[in-house]
Amino acid sequence: MESKEELAANNLNGENAQQENEGREQAPTQNEETRHLGGGEGQKPGGNIRRGRVRRLVPNFRWAIPNRHIEHNEARDDVERFVGQMMEIKRKTREQQMRHYMRFQTPEPDNHYDFCLIP
């Protein structure tokens, strides 16, 4: 039995031979003129030839797959930390939004006019 490398090499050689056979133009038979289908002299001949299967690299997404061996206690701690961070962010944004509103709601202190320089 052949190895995988030899099979791949034979498969590749077969595809190359098939491409060469498809790429050749047939010679005109006797009493038949060569016909040019559209296009001018500047076009490359055989532009619509099927080239066989195109081999593409498969992207590696292993970096996106999470590690399956996670201790549940660590995951619980991460969730608690994340929830705490979200609550802190919500509290800060609420304070920022309410700052402008509360500014007009609070009365002036008793000694405000003693220190206020605006007439």
Swiss-Prot record:
Region (Disordered): 1-53
This protein's UniProt keywords: Cytoplasm, Cytoskeleton, Metal-binding, Nucleus, Ubl conjugation, Zinc
Region annotation (Interaction with alpha-tubulin) ranges: 31-119
Gene Ontology biological-process entries: chromosome segregation; negative regulation of protein ubiquitination; negative regulation of tubulin deacetylation; regulation of cell migration; regulation of cell population proliferation
PANTHER family for this protein: PROTEIN BEX4
Family: Belongs to the BEX family.
Name by which UniProt lists this protein: Protein BEX4
Top-level taxonomy: Eukaryota, Metazoa, Chordata, Craniata, Vertebrata
